[in-house]
Regions:
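Alpha-helical transmembrane segments and their immediate juxtamembrane cytosolic regions
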Residues: 1-202
């Protein structure tokens, strides 16, 4: 079966999920900062830790699929963004402006190519670029900034602005959120094995 992953539903669905994930990550960054219990070292260490997992994914995918290995995927992005966003964690309206600019810039960079790979992390792709996972700084940093702005608005001083009753039956979703990194690391090999066996059966 020929499935087109470059357009249509198969293109839009993973990006919609990623947008929600990155937006919530921005809200979480704002929440952790407003607690007053963490400083830059926390974000630097956390960012480096996530980025190192991204590098591990790079090495694994290079060994498995060298023609489309992951050079700057969502873990690379989240690791870098966790550090770069630190000076903006207290900002509200300005983050909306910067977020919008970042998103527009990201779409503009889609039309730009370069003969070298050094600007991949910004959103400038080299010629004939193929990868399994790609989340450059632009436009995705803009989505994160919008999430930070939302977090600062809805949770000022680490308190919920809008009163909502607790929903204990949603605790499984909270568990998934607290362990999202491990879930991401596990889901890729599981999906690859699933697709492999489905391909064998068809």
């Amino acid at each position: 079966y020929d499935t087109d992953t470059a357009s249509g539903f198969c293109w839009a669905l993973p990006r919609a999920i990623a947008s929600v994930f990155i937006f919530i990550a921005g809200v979480s960054l704002a929440l952790s900062y407003s607690s007053g219990k963490v400083d830059f070292r926390h974000y630097a260490f956390r960012g480096l830790w996530i980025f190192m997992w991204g590098l591990a994914i790079t090495f694994v995918t290079y060994a498995a699929v060298p023609y489309a290995y992951i050079r700057f995927g969502i873990l690379h992005f989240m690791g870098l963004a966790a550090v770069l966003s630190y000076p903006l964690l207290k900002v509200r309206v300005m983050n909306l402006v910067l977020g919008f600019i970042s998103i527009v810039l990201g779409f503009a960079l889609k039309a730009v190519s370069a003969p070298y790979p050094y600007l991949i992390w910004l959103g400038v792709k080299p010629y004939f670029f193929h990868t399994l996972d790609y989340f450059p700084l632009f436009p995705w940093f803009g989505v994160l900034l919008v999430g930070i702005a939302a977090g600062n608005f809805f949770y000022p001083e680490h308190r919920r602005r809008i009163g909502l009753r607790e929903l204990p039956h949603l605790e499984p979703l909270c568990f998934l959120g607290r362990h999202s990194l491990m879930i991401y690391l596990v889901h890729q090999p599981v999906l690859l094995l699933f697709v492999y066996f489905i391909g064998k059966m068809i």
